[in-house]
From Swiss-Prot:
Disulfide bonds join 34-52, 40-57, 45-59, 81-102, 87-107, 95-109. It is found in: Secreted. Residues 1-28 form the signal peptide. GO terms for cellular component: extracellular region. It comes from Arabidopsis thaliana (Mouse-ear cress). Keywords: Antimicrobial, Disulfide bond, Fungicide, Plant defense, Secreted, Signal. It comes from the Eukaryota. This is Defensin-like protein 295. GO terms for biological process: defense response to fungus; killing of cells of another organism. Belongs to the DEFL family. Its main location: secreted.
Amino acid sequence: MASKITFVFLVVVVINCAMMLSMPTAEAHNFLPCVITNDCEYHHCSSGTVLCVNRQCHCSRSSTHQTKLDNLKKMDYAKKCKWTKDCDPRMRFTCVSGSYMCFDGLCTCTN
């Protein structure tokens, strides 16, 4: 009886280890804090580019927007503003919701 329990326990441990080793190869979501994209320069992306989205560094995988992303990477999203119209309209490409506004004097993505 004890040998069956030990065998089942070992099988469970082996299965759990195999599942942990077979994690998908997609990048882990390490959300580093940022204010502008330049704050993410040390965040490694295996493919695509890194962007500051909603104050967190994210890896972008879209190759169709690569030119836009290269331009956006150089932009300063902490731009000071008085009105939403003062914000750079290209900012909508990096906002998850696609919208942004002037909040507390800074251009900020909205949820």
